């Protein structure tokens, strides 16, 4: 089946669109990437998304208008690739996350992804699966991360323990134990590790007065000095790093509010030193999760997402994990930039075939669930 996956991460850089040929289901799952492209949002739409994600108040009318505008952008992105690469049988659309509230104190969590699935189905004329997180949340789960259910079939190993580390706006991991014993599937874990590129990108935008949106290759940060005392304070004073999994987070915690809270301390540093320290914090937060919550350090970390291109960040990760091999998912057959969109395509494919898409051991849900609402063109 040819399936098109759509997703835009918390950084809202653009819409990732992947077309994949999918066969099999789990142990026999086969995914061949046929096409991939990231299609940028119109600047005004991206600005509105980032305002909402930062907590900017909206009326219900404004929120529904934004939902429709994002759906239009997603549908247009899908049609662009379909025109270039041929028809597809199914669309999976994650939408644009603008808020995520994990469950707490016995209350169900909730998560808001904009991009109306029914509108995408109507505009494209193709059955569309969307709203993937709500079924897991309704079962008491975090609703995130969902990608580990796909990672375990595409990136596991018979000979080594692996971590798949996505570094998007937020960092998240999938722990993949060696598959050479009968219970390995039940030991797969995954959760959000904390900041990915979110704090770095926001700081770059501020320090460059809007001229830059990210630190290309980490080159700016690499010229600075790390304020280890400040980095250690962030790690010690943030209770998220002491919270055991399952857990999830978002830009609500690691966004503008974080930078504003620590503005006095950051402003005492040069621009390069600020970026070096924020880069170290991102790397250290990932390693902190490994050391505190994994059964052992992985033999190999497979990195994906935009952070893969930040060489300074990867150097800091390697320095803190000297015995661990660090590679890209590209090296093991999964396109590192298309990986999230591929996963959404697989989740939609599973939903269409009534295969549960969550891992309760990962999300904390009380049981497996069919993920996503299905919208057929009427």
Swiss-Prot record:
EC annotation from Swiss-Prot or TrEMBL: 2.7.1.170
Catalytic activity, as annotated? 1,6-anhydro-N-acetyl-beta-muramate + ATP + H2O = N-acetyl-D-muramate 6-phosphate + ADP + H(+)
Give any single GO term for biological process: peptidoglycan turnover
Protein origin, superkingdom? Bacteria
Name the CDD domains for this protein.
ASKHA_NBD_ANMK
Annotated ATP binding lies at 9-16
Q: Does the keyword ATP-binding apply?
A: yes
Q: Does the keyword Transferase apply?
A: yes
Instruction: Please state what class of enzyme this protein is.
Output: transferase
Hey, which pathway is this one from?
Amino-sugar metabolism; 1,6-anhydro-N-acetylmuramate degradation; Cell wall biogenesis; peptidoglycan recycling
Q: Recall the GO molecular function terms of this protein's record.
A: ATP binding; kinase activity; phosphotransferase activity, alcohol group as acceptor
Recite the UniProt keywords alphabetically. ATP-binding, Carbohydrate metabolism, Kinase, Nucleotide-binding, Transferase
PANTHER family with a match to the protein in the record? ANHYDRO-N-ACETYLMURAMIC ACID KINASE
Q: Which family does it belong to?
A: Belongs to the anhydro-N-acetylmuramic acid kinase family.
Task: Name the job this protein performs.
Answer: Catalyzes the specific phosphorylation of 1,6-anhydro-N-acetylmuramic acid (anhMurNAc) with the simultaneous cleavage of the 1,6-anhydro ring, generating MurNAc-6-P. Is required for the utilization of anhMurNAc either imported from the medium or derived from its own cell wall murein, and thus plays a role in cell wall recycling.
Q: What is the protein name for this chain?
A: Anhydro-N-acetylmuramic acid kinase
Q: Which organism is it from?
A: Synechococcus elongatus (strain ATCC 33912 / PCC 7942 / FACHB-805)
